[in-house]
């Protein structure tokens, strides 16, 4: 940001939340020409009030008015449906667990939004993500945010060189608590607004109930590791590896009295296998992943680095090698709990995000 000309026009994605509000303020303080854009990516509101488009737009407009910034409101819901949500449903139908936020960043926020912002005369876009961008000799790197507890590089690992070259992350060098304080000091209506959690189009609704409105139920058996029948499930799409909540099986059922967790899904038999406690079947050390994406030059394999198989996980030491089938093989130094097909595995070299891939199966 420091090297940009002050005549640079930046359009910031203003969501109606505290992060994008403060990001907008910081850009103005840097002296740039700033406009804002509110994205409507989903048509239906969460009735509980946690994912209200109307409320978010209202808050975004109040921030824009307070900062004297022009606000564009654009409906990208058709793009989101076609490029993100349909894929989300297809993956769940296969019994996998996709991450729509990763795809949303790649397809919507840093493609559709970027293209629209450029058509409005912007030189770059900005968002309230907690991540950093570094550039050296014309090559861009995605770095983790200064606030490790809020780092969002995991969700941004599919960005390419062009997208990074056109993007700014004003909050990358700031801690979340300081962002809140800045919002309070400036009297932002969003200062104490609850952070969005989970998938935005689901909000605080029950996940299985939401999914059931789009996917038909297919009853099958829930069995233990010995193949003993326990009860019926209503469809593999409604469960994920490592899941405990929603199984509705008391710990008293079984030998150990410990909680039950989803250990595996057998698509061919429409069977869900569950185990108790920290069972060995929940842990694996090797996985195969498809569609590897490297943010800069693809590394020479094999490669020693670290990886995350889910957001908020501490990076885990691993080695990446090439499989014969164009997939990559990842061997962790330690066993990993609940490796989940469909989820993203994201690779790091210290504070640099190298890229990632889609988990296909555990070995």
Curated annotation (Swiss-Prot):
It catalyses: S-sulfanyl-L-cysteinyl-[protein] + uridine(34) in tRNA + AH2 + ATP = 2-thiouridine(34) in tRNA + L-cysteinyl-[protein] + A + AMP + diphosphate + H(+). Keywords: ATP-binding, Cytoplasm, Disulfide bond, Nucleotide-binding, RNA-binding, Transferase, tRNA processing, tRNA-binding. GO terms for biological process: tRNA wobble position uridine thiolation. Disulfide bonds join 104-200. It comes from the Bacteria. Transmembrane segments: none annotated. GO terms for cellular component: cytoplasm. Pfam families: tRNA_Me_trans, tRNA_Me_trans_C, tRNA_Me_trans_M. Residues 99-101 are annotated as: Interaction with target base in tRNA. The keyword Transferase applies. Its EC number is 2.8.1.13. GO terms for molecular function: ATP binding; tRNA binding; tRNA-uridine 2-sulfurtransferase activity. It is an enzyme of class 2 (transferase). The record marks 129, 343 as: Interaction with tRNA. It is found in: Cytoplasm. ATP binds at residues 13-20, 39, 128. Residues 150-152, 310-311 are annotated as: Interaction with tRNA. PANTHER family: MITOCHONDRIAL TRNA-SPECIFIC 2-THIOURIDYLASE 1, TRNA 5-METHYLAMINOMETHYL-2-THIOURIDYLATE -METHYLTRANSFERASE. Belongs to the MnmA/TRMU family. Catalyzes the 2-thiolation of uridine at the wobble position (U34) of tRNA, leading to the formation of s(2)U34. This is tRNA-specific 2-thiouridylase MnmA. It comes from Ruthia magnifica subsp. Calyptogena magnifica.
């Amino acid at each position: 940001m420091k090297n940009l000309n002050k005549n640079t026009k930046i359009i910031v994605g203003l969501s109606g939340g505290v992060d994008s509000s403060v990001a907008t303020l910081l850009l103005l303080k840097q002296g740039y020409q700033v406009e804002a854009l509110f994205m409507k990516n989903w048509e239906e509101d969460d009735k509980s009030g946690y994912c209200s488009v109307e409320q978010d737009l209202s808050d975004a407009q109040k921030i824009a008015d307070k900062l004297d910034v022009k606000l564009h409101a654009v409906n990208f819901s058709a793009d989101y449906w076609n490029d993100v949500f349909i894929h989300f449903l297809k993956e769940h139908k296969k019994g996998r667990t996709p991450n729509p936020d990763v795809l949303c960043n790649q397809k919507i926020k840093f493609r559709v939004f970027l293209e629209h912002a450029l058509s409005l005369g912007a030189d770059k876009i900005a968002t309230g993500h907690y991540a950093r961008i570094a550039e050296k000799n014309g090559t861009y790197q995605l770095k983790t945010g200064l606030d490790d507890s809020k780092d969002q590089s995991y969700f941004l690992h599919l960005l390419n060189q062009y997208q990074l070259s056109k993007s700014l992350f004003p909050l990358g060098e700031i801690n979340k608590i300081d962002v809140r304080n800045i919002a309070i000091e400036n009297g932002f209506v969003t200062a104490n607004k609850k952070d969005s959690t989970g998938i935005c189009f689901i909000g605080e609704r029950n996940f299985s109930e939401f999914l059931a409105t789009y996917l038909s139920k297919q009853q099958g058996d829930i069995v233990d590791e010995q193949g003993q029948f326990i009860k019926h499930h209503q469809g593999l799409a409604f469960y994920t590896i490592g899941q405990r909540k929603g199984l509705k099986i008391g710990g008293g059922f079984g030998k150990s009295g410990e909680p039950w967790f989803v250990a595996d899904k057998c698509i061919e038999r429409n069977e869900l296998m569950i185990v108790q406690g920290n069972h060995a079947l929940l842990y694996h050390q090797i996985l195969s992943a498809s569609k590897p994406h490297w943010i800069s030059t693809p590394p020479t394999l094999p490669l020693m680095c670290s990886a995350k198989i889910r957001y908020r996980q501490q990076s885990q030491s691993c080695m990446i090698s090439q499989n014969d089938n164009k997939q990559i093989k990842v061997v962790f130094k330690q066993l990993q709990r609940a490796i989940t097909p469909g989820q993203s595995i994201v690779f790091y070299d210290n504070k640099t995000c190298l890229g990632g891939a889609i988990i296909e199966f555990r070995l």
